[in-house]
Amino acid sequence: MKRILVLFALFAAAAGYAQTVEKQTFVYAVKQTDTLRLDRYVALTPDSRTKPCLMFVFGGGFVGGRRDNASFLSYFEYYARKGYVVVSIDYRLGMKKAMQAGTLSEETFPEAWITTLAMATGDLYDATAYVCDHASAWGVDKTRIVASGSSAGAITVLMGEYGICNEHPMAQQKLPQDFNYAGVISYAGAIFDTQEELRWTKTPAPMLLFHGDADRNVPYDAVLYDGNGFFGSKHIADMLTERRIPHWFY
């Protein structure tokens, strides 16, 4: 996963662009003691037409990571130069909170895990709603918002799309009516569900999935335990293939 992002960085650096990509930071939500920000990288295109938007969610095992990590900047700038408005977001790190509170144990882990995913997915939805609310001012086409993420961030964007497709109450509450992402890009992600198979009430957005089969942190295929399932990129791709839903898996 990191190798792929590094390749993007090297490509962008080698291109030798003279223009500087403008970055602006906004607060999109305040939740108790957490002030959540997003960085907007302005698209470098000469015309005034509305632009697609690439949203990015960083990784770090839900215990660490930063939206403005220097290793991601060339990735953001690459897409900004291709005409995308790029948005990199904060989100609450549920596992970090549980560890800091001293409440994380083998017994409490399942509940903490579900809470962590709900936190991250809810924050993604709030950030997406913020982008939609500012779409006119930012020149964003709300029908062309792509969600991307790395590792824990990839889990978050996949969970976000999964919630939309299954009409999860949180998605319906936080997002504009009938909203869906134009696409999902997942670098080593997976979907968790409290049942032993994925379900798609609605057709998901086209997906671009990257995942290494030696990943020790996020399952490459499917892991089933005690009635729950954690479904990695291969399993997702196999199901999308069966349903003839557009996707690419590397």
Residue ranges of model-derived segments:
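Short beta-strand element of the alpha/beta-hydrolase
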Residues: R49-G61
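Alpha/beta-hydrolase active-site loop
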Residues: E106-S136
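Primarily recognizes the serine-hydrolase "nucleophile elbow" in alpha/beta-hydrolase
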Residues: D126-T203
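Bacterial Sec-dependent N-terminal signal peptides
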Residues: M1-E22
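Short amphipathic alpha-helix adjacent to the substrate-entry channel of hydrolases
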Residues: R67-I89, G94-A98
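The feature captures the conserved acid-bearing segment of alpha/beta-hydrolase catalytic domains
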Residues: A171-R243
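Cap/lid segment of the alpha/beta-hydrolase catalytic domain
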Residues: R66-R67, Y91-A118
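N-terminal cap/lid segment of alpha/beta-hydrolase-fold proteins
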Residues: A18-R49
